[in-house]
Amino acid sequence: MLAWWMLLPTLLAMMVALVLPGFMWLRAGGRSSLVAVAAAPAFTFGLVTALSVAYPALDIEWEPSTALPVLGLSAIGGAAAWALSFFHRSNGGFSLRGVPLREAIGVRVPIGGAQAAVRASTWGAILVGFLVAAWPLLAGADPANPVQQWDPTFHQNGVHAILYGKDASPFGGLHELYGGRSVYYPTGWHAFVALFARYDSVVQTANVSSLALMAVWVIGLAA
């Protein structure tokens, strides 16, 4: 279990990267916080896929230093859009009408006790659901051991190929796994995991991504 605790920073970093960029934009669009958290990973994977296609054409290597800042900028842009959206809804438009900004925005109305109880019970159920889903992996597996099936071996080698080749494109990024031939294969997961893996930690990072995706799955069910 201690080995899993040592990987907690990686899990938290993955969850931030999965949720934050899309969460801001979805909140700007008026979605609830639960729906925004549930749908945000799809936004992030869409952005990761778009970058993985664009970077080879721009001769940009696929690395944390080149991809993660774009995710961060997306979150900042979404936060700005959310702030403007909130201001527009609260003020009935963008004009201050001669009053201070704080007064124009107004004080957010606190949620009632019943709504707070619903939120707490919902997120509590999500936590329980995640622990139920994750416990067999946490209690029965060493994160340094690959999953004992043939398919994970292919996908972990795909992450290795991206780390070595610096190319995460679905149009040839995994060519080393196909005898050097450039074939189409969706690489969203591989590209994302490669942002958090080192050459000697692909298996551990892949296993941590399973925990992150469990959380996404449970939150999606709740939403």
What are these regions (language model features)?
Residues 1-118:
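Membrane-embedded, hydrophobic transmembrane alpha-helices
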Residues 35, 39, 122-124, 216, ...:
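Core alpha-helical transmembrane segments of integral membrane proteins
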Residues 112-137:
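Internal/C-terminal transmembrane anchor helices
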Residues 4-5, 25, 62, 82, ...:
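A residue-identity detector for tryptophan
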Residues 2-4, 121-126, 201:
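Generic detector of short, locally flexible boundary/turn motifs and exposed helical patches
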Residues 128-223:
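Active-site lumenal/periplasmic loops and adjacent helix-entry segments of GT-C-fold
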Residues 18, 50, 75, 127-130, ...:
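Hydrophobic alpha-helical transmembrane segments of multipass integral membrane proteins
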